[in-house]
Regions:
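Positively charged n-region of N-terminal signal peptides that target proteins for export
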Residues: 1-4
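Boundary/linker segments of alpha-helical solenoid repeat arrays
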Residues: 123-135
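N-terminal alpha-helical interaction modules that lie
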Residues: 26-91, 123, 142-155, 161-169, ...
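TPR/TPR-like (Sel1-like) alpha-helical repeat modules
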Residues: 110-126, 153-157
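Short coil/turn connectors between adjacent alpha-helices in alpha-solenoid helical repeat scaffolds
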Residues: 64-68, 105-111
Length: 199
């Protein structure tokens, strides 16, 4: 009887020790079985596909902004609703939402797009790296500061001659490369090509 009691106590102590060792590290042998897989939101993927389709006709001159503008506003409204409801969970969700937000015209939306890209990258979605740089550049451009990654071009002249928006040239090409952004020299070469094409 005494032997059985000792064995029972040993088993209880081992179980208690397992709990003490496991809990501080947030590990549980049942976690993987209890946690259902998190799926991307199909609606966000569809909204981003529509956003891109509106911007990529065979001839860019065929984009009718009187039609695309209201569509953008509706997509933006829906993305903000999903974000406010804490529906975004996966890297793809954050990336899709950021892509739509960065087509806003408000600095706060560009900043949120950048933050969503950071979240997407942290969840393993490398597609968001370039967009993280571009959304930061859009934010800076919108508040009148030089962009950092040379992703943004503007056309200010009457004949809409594109030029690279002013760039903070202290940012290194290595950092640009880490975010899947072309070098500053490549951005300037693209600017020259766009200007030649416009003549």
């Amino acid at each position: 009887m005494k032997s059985r009691t000792i064995n029972a106590l040993l088993i209880l102590n081992l179980l208690a020790l397992t709990v003490v060792l496991v809990r501080p590290y947030g590990i549980s042998p049942l976690t993987s079985a209890q946690t259902p897989p998190i799926n991307d939101i199909p609606e966000l993927a569809r909204l981003m596909a529509e956003d891109q389709a509106d911007r990529t006709p065979d001839d860019p001159k065929l984009i009718d902004w009187k039609i695309v503008g209201p569509r953008d506003a509706a997509r933006l409204k829906r993305v903000k609703e999903l974000y406010a409801q804490n529906k975004l969970k996966t890297g793809a969700d954050y990336y899709h939402a950021a892509m739509i937000l960065q087509h806003s015209d408000a600095a706060d939306d560009f900043l949120l797009a950048h933050e969503l890209c950071v979240a997407a990258i942290s969840k393993g979605d490398a597609r968001a790296k370039w967009l993280a740089a571009a959304s930061e550049d859009r934010f800076l451009m919108n508040i009148g500061r030089p962009q950092r990654f040379a992703t943004q071009f503007r056309c200010d002249s009457p004949n809409c001659e594109f030029h690279l928006y002013k760039v903070d040239e202290t940012v290194t090409d290595e950092l640009r490369k880490a975010l899947d952004v072309p070098s500053l020299a490549e951005a300037k070469a693209r600017e020259a090509k766009m200007q030649r094409k416009n003549k």
